[in-house]
Curated annotation (Swiss-Prot):
This is Receptor tyrosine-protein kinase erbB-2. Homodimer. Heterodimer with EGFR, ERBB3 and ERBB4. Part of a complex with EGFR and either PIK3C2A or PIK3C2B. May interact with PIK3C2B when phosphorylated on Tyr-1196. Interacts with PLXNB1. Interacts (when phosphorylated on Tyr-1248) with MEMO1. Interacts with MUC1; the interaction is enhanced by heregulin (HRG). Interacts (when phosphorylated on Tyr-1139) with GRB7 (via SH2 domain). Interacts (when phosphorylated on Tyr-1248) with ERBIN. Interacts with KPNB1, RANBP2, EEA1, CRM1 and CLTC. Interacts with PTK6. Interacts with RPA194 and ACTB. Interacts with PRKCABP, SRC and MYOC. Protein tyrosine kinase that is part of several cell surface receptor complexes, but that apparently needs a coreceptor for ligand binding. Essential component of a neuregulin-receptor complex, although neuregulins do not interact with it alone. GP30 is a potential ligand for this receptor. Regulates outgrowth and stabilization of peripheral microtubules (MTs). Upon ERBB2 activation, the MEMO1-RHOA-DIAPH1 signaling pathway elicits the phosphorylation and thus the inhibition of GSK3B at cell membrane. GO terms for biological process: cell population proliferation; cell surface receptor protein tyrosine kinase signaling pathway; cell surface receptor signaling pathway; cellular response to epidermal growth factor stimulus; cellular response to growth factor stimulus; enzyme-linked receptor protein signaling pathway; epidermal growth factor receptor signaling pathway; ERBB2-EGFR signaling pathway. The gene is ERBB2. It is found in: Cell membrane; Cell projection, Ruffle membrane.
């Protein structure tokens, strides 16, 4: 199958101006140099195509013609749309004297509009018989050819051809022809006569004086494209081609673009015009459709009209083919996604497929219309071992039994021997032939072993010829009325070498006697084209079963159609008048006027009605309405099938009365209680207002901050059991342990932070500060405190995180992490930091090592050793000293010790970089002293290989020098939530689709599960439930009992924020910071993360609670299961030792402006963090808490120095937790004399330095 066949045009008729003669438009061919499909009928094929034709819509190919071929049918051709090919002919003349223009819309070998090749015997051939003239083309005789719009000329190997070298081809080529090539061979075997003396310049197409070349370009005056003479007044109109007879665009011999009723135009008139007066688009009565180079009032038959005014063979994208009632076909835009259609060979995904095979036959299952063609070649039934294609089995051909229409052609050159006909296409009605085989045939059957055709439903061959030849067993070819199938006079049947008709008749292979006019597709009454009597289904019959036989029938247009099954057969008369139940003469069972029915309706609901209908049959079989029309609970029926009368019993009345009285009493009691409670509330509020007015002794100075209603759970040491050490530092040790609450038969795995003996009061104070911070947060993505044990050494109890820290997790599972994992973690960290921003908490130490992994899909921010709460009037925090992570800090934090939420954004960008590099060290190999200069010069961390520019640009925005230019955390939440829904678009990991799923464990995780006593444990979040009386203004007596027994009840929360849930501030409730804003415009963290996290604690609320809170989702793209938990207590992650000592840097003394601690607040006042605050310059409040050395986490330790002797030797494990990530801004003094050095000291490790610039 040739792809060029898609461009073949069917035989069509286009009209010239009124009163002018009709222009016959015919199809071209697309065989190129291939041998004819049927050499015996090749000349007949050309004659049928071009007889009387004037415009060839395609290519004019004249090949393999014998010497005696009569080609007079070509003499009317004036225009060719494609190319002209004259090749491999023995004929001496080709009468194309009237051909004026070759447009070259298709080109031979993509370059040539005129190709004349191998016409005649080769030059080295033997001499022909004496007296016989050698065959071959002798003269072109294209005396009228004056225009080739596109393409060149190729004339090669024509030994008898003369005069081709005398033609001035430049004059014929259009001035804009970019392919004006001429390859002309002048070798010939005979002597040529000179041109006639009448020919100027000896330029001619033959030796006659009529064959002189007409020049219409090179002789023109300047500026003319074509002319009729050398004078300036002889110029043709710019829309003319091939010359003219006058200066107007109606005097053209051919049109350059479009012929509109004999006038050459640049465009055809539009179908719609715009009315500037009414501002409306109006139909244009002069509008025309574009068809080839002509403007037509309607698209020719078999073509599709479009809304843009063109005639096409295939509808454009998002359009569908529609057939109007008058039979015209057009393309209509789909109002919704176009319905799926069946494509055939040469279309869409089957464009390069040659034949129907077992590999693609299922593409046609259930298809009624195929847009394309069907071809069956020997390879279809032989199979192809090279492509592992099995042979096509005969039973597989049954998929075509539903086929009714083919828009292309049907070509069959191979068929199973077991099938005597083509009856698998018995329902095929139309072969449109918009695409033709070799540009000529819509139906081709050759070399088959079938005995008859069997195409009993075929009614139309829309275009092209039918070729049936070399089918040695085929009969019934002449019994088909082919003329009734064709749609234009240039179509015909070409048949040769089939079984002789007399042999067929001799063997009884003739049409059935019931076939009208002896027309049939095969033997038997089912193969008739039309029936002489009646048609029942697909079979011709002598009479219908109107008066006898079952089932009874009625006659409609000589078709026998069955009566309805409920019609009673009549003797000697008709039974029905139509197919419906209301068209019966008598009913077989019952009649529910006007329909015959099998039974009367009993409780049947008619269409569009909710009221059932009950009927019963009377003595005559007619359905009558029942006296009672029951609507529900119709159980009891009488002997007629009608509902029995329902009588209410006395017991029912008594029960109804009692229930009514009780309902009234209950409602009265309820209303009385409500009224009494309302009066009590009014009395209580009045008394409280009066007492406040008389007892206030000093004015109120409210801060506007929300009260911190978090609760601290106090645990006893007997409830805790330490299992093994997870890590140690200079100030304490982290244990894996089990919490066994008193009176509860549960074991909860926990992490226990224990301060060392003889630690300084400052260390105790700072671990309590960390406990204060951890207890006050409540987000699914931030670790919270489970409790605190106030023994001689303070112990913090948090939930055990079995997967360890995120930094180790990504390093261990580098090859098993996907883009969705990384983007989900980035989104969850951003949500956690957004929550901390909303509660005015500056973390100051955000890094991958300080993010714990609860599950591969859930991470939490931890390690609040450096975190600081901002007061209600604070916007930033200035640190006094201590150890800080230099390579994660923003530039203003390094230079001015200024920490804000936007400096946390900088750290967030570095954390994302760590994830995207699978745990690489930022600025690895660069000393810490060089980091400030490096950042000020504009250098930043490089783009990770797996990151797209979208993700990297978010990191770059986080590292802007101006903190106000960095994105807010809520913006980062939005960005990474969007990316997490389409992860592979933003993070590119090689072979991600082929890799394993996300890791489910880690080395740290496996080490935590090694102990035998860790079995049968209960997760802390499953154990903790809301406590009683959390927000109750008037707690019940005894509410201060056991801490872990106060979780049995809750109160409700109304909209607007006036009342809050009576829940313990556990993982399910997010208590507000004492400095959190009290305005109504809350954070989306509270609306989303808090609300979702609270759902688990709300399980004990009353069922009428209207709270809109819902659970949060760990994965933004996957709905959260009901059993999924989202909260994890923190577990400190200890990375490899990366600390360095800075012994020469001394701490800064406290500011003398800082005053003593404020007096304790009275009982019942709002809980606030104890703080030592004093106003500084510009009203900035500074916190005198030190940076480092406040917690037992070894990542925050100030390393031991060697400047002075130690009273006690350091522990053996202490150096193992020196962390190079942290920079000691204010190390403790070692007993050496105070240093007066003002600047950057020299240290043992030049990568990490301390700064002593005062704040």
């Amino acid at each position: 199958m040739e792809l060029a066949a898609l461009c073949r045009w069917g035989l069509l008729l286009a009209l010239l101006p009124p009163g002018a003669a009709s222009t016959q438009v015919c199809t071209g061919t697309d065989m190129k140099l291939r041998l004819p499909a049927s050499p015996e009928t090749h000349l007949d094929m050309l004659r049928h195509l071009y007889q009387g034709c004037q415009v060839v819509q395609g290519n004019l190919e004249l090949t393999y013609l014998p010497t005696n071929a009569s080609l007079s049918f070509l003499q009317d051709i004036q225009e060719v749309q494609g190319y002209v090919l004259i090749a491999h002919n023995q004929v001496r003349q080709v009468p194309l004297q009237r051909l004026r223009i070759v447009r070259g819309t298709q080109l031979f070998e993509d370059n040539y509009a005129l190709a004349v090749l191998d016409n005649g015997d080769p030059l080295n051939n033997t001499t022909p018989v004496t007296g016989a003239s050698p065959g071959g083309l002798r003269e072109l005789q294209l005396r009228s050819l004056t225009e080739i719009l596109k393409g060149g000329v190729l004339i090669q190997r024509n030994p008898q051809l003369c005069y081709q070298d005398t033609i001035l081809w430049k004059d014929i080529f259009h001035k804009n022809n970019q392919l004006a090539l001429t390859l002309i061979d002048t070798n010939r075997s005979r002597a040529c006569h000179p041109c006639s003396p009448m020919c100027k310049g000896s330029r001619c197409w033959g030796e006659s004086s009529e064959d002189c070349q007409s020049l219409t370009r090179t002789v023109c005056a300047g500026g003319c494209a074509r002319c009729k003479g050398p004078l300036p007044t002889d110029c043709c109109h710019e829309q003319c081609a091939a010359g003219c007879t006058g200066p107007k665009h109606s005097d053209c011999l051919a049109c350059l673009h479009f012929n509109h009723s004999g006038i050459c135009e640049l465009h055809c008139p539009a179908l719609v015009t715009y009315n500037t007066d009414t501002f409306e688009s109006m139909p244009n009565p002069e509008g025309r459709y574009t068809f080839g180079a002509s403007c037509v009032t309607a698209c020719p038959y078999n073509y599709l009209s479009t809304d843009v005014g063109s005639c096409t063979l295939v509808c454009p994208l998002h359009n569908q083919e529609v057939t109007a009632e008058d039979g015209t076909q057009r393309c209509e835009k789909c109002s919704k996604p176009c319905a799926r259609v069946c494509y055939g060979l040469g279309m869409e995904h089957l464009r390069e497929v040659r034949a129907v095979t077992s590999a693609n036959i299922q593409e046609f299952a259930g298809c009624k219309k195929i847009f394309g063609s069907l071809a069956f070649l020997p390879e279809s039934f032989d199979g192809d071992p090279a492509s592992n294609t099995a042979p096509l089995q005969p039973e597989q051909l049954q998929v075509f039994e539903t086929l009714e229409e083919i828009t292309g052609y049907l070509y069959i050159s191979a068929w199973p021997d077991s099938l005597p006909d083509l009856s698998v296409f018995q329902n095929l009605q139309v072969i449109r032939g918009r695409i033709l085989h070799n540009g000529a045939y819509s139906l081709t059957l050759q070399g088959l072993g079938i005995s008859w055709l069997g195409l009993r439903s075929l009614r139309e061959l829309g275009s092209g010829l039918a070729l049936i030849h070399h089918n040695t067993h085929l009969c019934f070819v002449h019994t088909v009325p082919w003329d009734q199938l064709f749609r234009n006079p240039h179509q015909a049947l070409l048949h040769t070498a089939n079984r002789p008709e007399d042999e067929c008749v001799g063997e009884g292979l003739a049409c059935h006697q019931l076939c009208a006019r002896g027309h049939c597709w095969g033997p038997g009454p089912t193969q008739c084209v039309n029936c002489s009597q009646f048609l029942r289904g697909q079979e011709c019959v002598e009479e219908c079963r109107v008066l006898q036989g079952l089932p009874r029938e009625y006659v409609n247009a000589r078709h026998c159609l069955p009566c309805h099954p409920e019609c009673q057969p009549q003797n000697g008369s008709v039974t029905c008048f139509g197919p419906e139940a209301d068209q019966c003469v008598a009913c077989a069972h019952y009649k529910d006027p006007p329909f015959c029915v099998a039974r009367c309706p009993s409780g049947v609901k008619p269409d569009l009605s909710y009221m059932p209908i009950w009927k019963f049959p009377d003595e005559e079989g007619a359905c009558q309405p029942c006296p009672i029309n029951c609507t529900h609970s119709c159980v009891d029926l009488d002997d007629k099938g009608c509902p029995a009368e329902q009588r209410a019993s006395p017991l029912t009345s008594i029960i109804s009365a009692v229930v009514g009285i009780l309902l009234v009493v209950v409602l009265g009691v309820v209303f009385g209680i409500l009224i009494k409670r309302r009066q009590q509330k009014i009395r209580k509020y009045t008394m409280r207002r009066l007492l406040q007015e008389t007892e206030l002794v000093e004015p109120l100075t409210p801060s506007g901050a929300m009260p911190n209603q978090a609760q601290m759970r106090i645990l006893k040491e007997t409830e805790l059991r330490k299992v093994k050490v997870l890590g140690s530092g200079a100030f304490g040790t982290v244990y894996k342990g089990i919490w066994i609450p008193d009176g509860e038969n549960v074991k909860i795995p926990v992490a226990i932070k224990v301060l060392r003996e003889n630690t300084s009061p400052k260390a105790n104070k700072e671990i309590l500060d960390e406990a204060y911070v951890m207890a006050g947060v409540g987000s699914p993505y931030v670790s919270r405190l489970l409790g605190i044990c106030l023994t001689s050494t303070v112990q913090l109890v948090t939930q055990l995180m079995p997967y360890g820290c995120l930094l180790d997790h990504v390093r261990e599972n580098r090859g098993r992490l996907g883009s969705q994992d990384l983007l989900n973690w980035c989104m969850q960290i951003a949500k956690g930091m957004s929550y901390l921003e909303d509660v005015r908490l500056v973390h100051r130490d955000l890094a991958a090592r300080n993010v714990l992994v609860k599950s591969p899909n859930h991470v939490k921010i931890t390690d609040f050793g450096l975190a600081r709460l901002l007061d209600i009037d604070e916007t930033e925090y200035h640190a006094d000293g201590g150890k800080v992570p230099i390579k994660w800090m923003a530039l203003e934090s390094i230079l001015r010790r200024r920490f804000t939420h936007q400096s946390d954004v900088w750290s967030y960008g570095v954390t994302v970089w760590e994830l995207m590099t699978f745990g690489a060290k930022p600025y690895d190999g660069i000393p810490a002293r060089e980091i400030p200069d490096l950042l000020e010069k504009g250098e930043r961390l490089p783009q990770p290989p797996i990151c797209t520019i979208d993700v990297y640009m978010i990191m770059v925005k986080c590292w802007m020098i101006d903190s106000e230019c960095r994105p807010r955390f809520r913006e980062l939440v939005s960005e990474f939530s969007r990316m997490a829904r389409d992860p592979q678009r933003f993070v590119v990991i090689q072979n991600e689709d082929l890799g394993p799923a996300s890791p489910l464990d880690s080395t740290f995780y496996r080490s935590l599960l090694e102990d035998d006593d860790m079995g049968d444990l209960v997760d802390a979040e499953e154990y903790l439930v809301p406590q009683q009386g959390f927000f109750c203004p008037d707690p019940a007596p005894g509410a201060g009992g056991m801490v872990h027994h106060r979780h049995r009840s809750s109160s409700t929360r109304s909209g607007g924020g006036d009342l809050t849930l009576g829940l313990e501030p556990s993982e399910e409730e997010a208590p507000r910071s004492p400095l959190a804003p009290s305005e109504g415009a809350g954070s989306d963290v509270f609306d989303g993360d808090l609300g979702m996290g609270a759902a688990k604690g709300l399980q004990s609320l009353p069922t009428h609670d209207p709270s809109p809170l819902q659970r949060y989702s760990e994965d933004p793209t996957v709905p959260l299961p009901s059993e999924t938990d989202g909260y994890v207590a923190p577990l400190t992650c200890s990375p490899q030792p990366e600390y360095v000592n800075q012994p020469d840097v001394r701490p800064q003394p406290p500011s003398p402006r800082e005053g003593p601690l404020p007096a304790a607040r009275p009982a019942g006042a709002t809980l606030e963090r104890p703080k030592t605050l004093s106003p500084g310059k510009n009203g900035v409040v500074k916190d005198v808490f030190a940076f480092g050395g406040a917690v037992e986490n070894p990542e925050y330790l100030t390393p031991q120095g060697g400047a002075a002797p130690q009273p006690h030797p350091p522990p053996a494990f202490s150096p193992a937790f020196d962390n190079l990530y942290y920079w000691d801004q204010d190390p403790p003094e070692r007993g050496a004399p105070p240093s007066t050095f003002k600047g950057t000291p020299t240290a043992e490790n030049p990568e990490y330095l301390g700064l002593d610039v005062p704040v």
